[in-house]
């Protein structure tokens, strides 16, 4: 894992979120959702956001690096805009404990996982990036903010 790339990605994403937040006069979390949409489709009138997203793509982050970047970004967000209790993300320790239990109880190479109430997807991302198995994962969340 390249921590310099994670720091650069964090800086680009944070700047983009702040630009979008100011432009739309919205919350950090809503601006983050907008940033994700802009990253995927590239449609925005905000030139600095476009430049930062191009730089993000050039970093070619791996799955684990994306996960860490977003964890740091969400921790930053929680400093300025507190999350509701049901919006808190799953700590890595819980994810690694679940991975250990799954790997011990299910020795098969392929595992299907269903996570009801997947929230921000941090636990699911931990499964997908850290397990030594082929995973068929489905996370379901009803809260559209998450």
Regions found by a protein language model. Give the residues of each.
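Generic hydrophobic/packing signal
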Residues: 73-81, 102, 106
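Class I SAM-dependent methyltransferase Rossmann-like catalytic core
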Residues: 80-93
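Conserved SAM-binding loop of SAM-dependent methyltransferases across substrates and taxa
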Residues: 120-133
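Conserved Rossmann-like nucleotide-cofactor binding loop
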Residues: 145
